Amino acid sequence: IVHGTNVEDGTLQGYLKMFNLPYVGCDVISSAVGMDKYVSKIILKENDIPVLDCKCFYKNEEIEDIVKEVEENIKYPVIVKPINLGSSVGIVVAKNSEELENAVDDAFTYARKILIEKAIENLKEVNCSVLGDYEECDASECEELEKTSDILSYEDKYISGGKKTGGAKQSMNAGVLKLPANISKEQKEKIQRLAKETFKTLGCTGVIRIDFLIDEETNKIYVNEVNTIPGCLSFHLWRETGVMYTDLLDKEIELALKRNREEQNMTFSFDTNVLEGYANGLQGGKGMKM
């Protein structure tokens, strides 16, 4: 279980898979998709899982054009995120065009592709973990990131300021985690259901954590981000359900071995002369009139 560049995005998983070695956690595809904030949102949206409206931009695009498109399609305030970084690195809130230009410029120092999405001003953030595979999975208890006096706003809750603004960047973890989350039974059940749907839609395996946003004005719930290798495997969320850390590790290993056995029994080659027959057909068809 590792964290960082090239080990959460499917790179390491692909390397291990080449040697037919079992490994815990998500496979190559789900790891890569989970790391790409835009791709994961598009897939979830296509499967009727609620996500915030967003746009993706590349480094070669003019900042003025980016600002114009955002103002026409998303509206302020917005969140600017590097597309494939974790731990809230490079995430900035923008409430006007000047802040957006600075935020975009800042985000492009971390990645060549960025995500810009609508910000919820009156939000509650809730996290939920999922454990299992494509056949069966369970959702954990839910936790809430409770805002303190230092992080009352959405901007402070994420990361405030960019490299040009001189603002102090604060971690999302500056808040206090409240376990269980202060949400209704209906909200909890919906979050757990959406968590499991997200898990299966992205083809995950093992333990992941999904971050949700609740709009307290509308009570709408959105999937925010997927963490395919959560810190400490989000054990504290499972402890609330009676799952011990050793049980969590055993289950991770069990699922890894199960997947490896299934892959070993798959057929990855198919002997056929279909291409040869196609080529012969082309040769035999020379000179034919249509």
Features from the language model and the residues they span:
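Hydrophobic (often cysteine-bearing) scaffold residues that line and stabilize catalytic clefts
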Residues: 12, 36, 187, 191
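Phosphate-binding site of ATP-dependent enzymes
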Residues: 95-171, 182-187, 221
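Generic preference for hydrophobic
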Residues: 23, 54, 80, 116, ...
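Glycine-rich phosphate/pyrophosphate-binding beta-alpha loops
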Residues: 3-4, 88, 145-148, 227-239
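Active-site nucleotide/adenylate-binding loops and adjacent lid/helix of ATP-dependent enzymes
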Residues: 31-123, 134
